[in-house]
């Protein structure tokens, strides 16, 4: 993944081409009169649950009442926290909701605890260290009364009630291992996270920490340099961007980023570049490799297989679902990593196998070179699973590489997107709905609805059975963040980058049904 265009907030740059407990000082609050005042419901993990399904269990929002979804409260970022990081906005994390409190991190690494019912700021942990990997995504985890988060170079734990710092570890990353920019997962006494954009041996690394002390338990390199049968040229990158999957079988699975290489390099010195563009399954206690499934070997398009893996059961078979910017959904056997099916989503221009051809010395390219899905498209945000259906928000955004020595093209073409439903067992597309905008808010299920948000600043919902659009709500700013649904409330971070040279005021907005 390109170091300047990484994670969810990379979108802003592409669109521009085409178009420490302190007193609460980081934001202001407005509350809608007559809105539902509820503190019920939860969204306890980055993707709703440890299986990463993004299915809002216990949600009160459905097809029958979504038309009544109204603004409940708005929290406005102020001061330094409201300043754009790297020109791509202020918010890229997904909210966490536990015990009536919504937790959120901004791209300056500051953490907020807000009342779910009123939006009142309970406490703020001030870091003021801008996220550097993309910037973004980032975010926190909240487990057993402790908030876990990271700044670019350190990991910290806070008391969830007071925001008081419990521990911090500043010695986890070595030179060349990149920086932190991921929403961690916490389970079984361990904190799982990763670095991004490693530039030296090992590339980005996967880590597990002791949740009580912050001490390193294990570390796994996502780039190998001497494995039998692997010709890895050590160009760096790799690592993971999205929250990993912690499974009941004692494993943890990460979606890994791309190798940092040009088309010219991939053609002249082809390499599988393990474990880039793969889902990597490790023993959760030891970090030992169990299996991997590589979507694109020898990738030179900055594709990534970065989406949070999802745990599922397909006709009695434990499976893992993965996906990424190459525009494919993959289903793998959870025990072996064997690929069961893969399905293309979104638009493709016939060059899906270029990396495979280069690996076999059969690819010839000339610039300019049009890439679709582009490096800012495909499956950029996380998928959802409910019942026997997988829901995917897909971005169609081509990139033009004007030189084969570029790592990333600089000219974006016409942009569009869709939300699709796939059968869990077969991968067959059940419905495909086009949208007027870029769906980068992750797919999220609420009863018989599927929600996402559009980059341009719209919350949107679909009929889960048919794909028909049934709800739209204009947001106060552009958005790069996933939403969270807790009970009767939808929380939407709206703090994305500029559009047409203009930028709104970054806010965290809650909508609720009566």
Describe the function of each predicted region.
Residues 2-18:
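Bacterial N-terminal signal peptides that target proteins for export
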Residues 14-28:
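Bacterial N-terminal signal peptides
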Residues 26-36:
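Sec-dependent signal peptide cleavage junction
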Residues 37-86, 120-129, 164-173, 215-224, ...:
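Aromatic (tryptophan-biased) beta-strands that constitute blades/sheets of beta-rich domains
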Residues 40-50, 87-110, 132-155, 177-206, ...:
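Repeat-blade elements of multi-bladed beta-propeller folds
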Residues 63-66, 100, 116, 160, ...:
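Inter-blade boundary loops/turns of WD-repeat beta-propellers
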Residues 113, 157, 208, 279-281, ...:
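Conserved blade-register residue in beta-propeller folds
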Residues 274, 280-284, 290, 302-361:
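Acidic, glycine-rich loop-and-beta core segments that form the ion-binding/anion-interacting portion
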């Amino acid at each position: 993944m390109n170091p300047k265009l990484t994670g969810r907030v990379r979108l802003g740059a592409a669109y521009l081409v085409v178009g420490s407990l302190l007193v609460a000082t980081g934001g202001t609050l407005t509350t809608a009169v007559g809105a539902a005042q509820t503190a019920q419901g939860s969204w306890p993990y980055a993707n709703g649950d440890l299986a990463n399904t993004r299915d809002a269990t216990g949600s009160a929002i459905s097809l029958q009442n979504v038309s009544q979804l109204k603004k409940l409260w708005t929290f406005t970022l102020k001061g330094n926290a409201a300043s754009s990081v790297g020109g791509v906005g202020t918010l890229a994390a997904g909210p966490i909701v536990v015990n009536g409190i919504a937790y959120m991190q901004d791209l300056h690494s500051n953490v907020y605890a807000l009342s779910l019912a009123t939006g009142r700021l309970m406490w703020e942990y001030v870091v003021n260290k801008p996220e550097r990997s993309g910037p973004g995504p980032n975010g926190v985890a909240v487990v057993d009364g402790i908030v876990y988060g990271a700044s670019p170079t350190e990991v910290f734990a806070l008391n969830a009630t007071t925001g008081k710092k419990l521990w911090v570890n500043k010695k986890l990353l070595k030179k060349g291992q990149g920086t932190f920019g991921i929403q961690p997962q916490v389970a079984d006494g361990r904190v799982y996270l990763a670095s991004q954009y490693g530039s030296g041996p090992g590339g980005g690394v996967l880590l597990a920490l002791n949740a009580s002390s912050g001490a390193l338990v294990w570390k796994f390199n996502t780039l190998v340099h001497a494995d039998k049968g692997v010709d890895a040229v050590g160009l760096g990158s790799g690592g993971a961007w999205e929250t990993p999957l912690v499974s009941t079988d004692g494993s943890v699975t990460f979606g890994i980023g791309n190798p940092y290489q040009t088309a010219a390099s991939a053609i002249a010195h082809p390499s599988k570049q393990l474990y880039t563009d793969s889902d990597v399954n490790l023993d959760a206690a030891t970090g030992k490799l169990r299996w991997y499934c590589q979507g694109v070997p020898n990738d030179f398009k900055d594709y990534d297989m970065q989406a949070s893996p999802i745990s599922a059961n397909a006709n009695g078979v434990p499976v893992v679902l993965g996906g990424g910017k190459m525009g494919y959904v993959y289903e793998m056997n959870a025990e072996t990593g064997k690929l069961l099916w893969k399905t293309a989503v979104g638009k493709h221009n016939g060059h899906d196998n270029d990396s495979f051809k280069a690996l076999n010395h059969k690819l010839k390219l000339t610039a300019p070179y049009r890439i679709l899905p582009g490096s800012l498209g495909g499956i950029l945000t996380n998928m959802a699973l409910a019942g026997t259906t997988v829901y995917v928000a897909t971005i169609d955004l081509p990139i033009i590489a004007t030189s084969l020595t570029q790592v990333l093209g600089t000219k974006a073409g016409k942009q569009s997107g869709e939300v699709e439903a796939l059968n869990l067992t077969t991968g067959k597309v059940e419905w495909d709905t086009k949208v007027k905008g870029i769906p980068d808010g992750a797919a999220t299920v609420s009863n018989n609805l599927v929600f996402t948000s559009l980059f341009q600043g719209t919350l949107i919902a679909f009929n889960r059975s048919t794909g028909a659009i049934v709800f739209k709500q204009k947001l106060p700013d552009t958005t790069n963040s996933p939403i969270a649904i807790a009970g009767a409330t939808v929380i939407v971070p709206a703090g994305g980058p500029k559009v047409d040279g203009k930028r709104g005021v970054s806010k965290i907005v809650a909508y609720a049904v009566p």
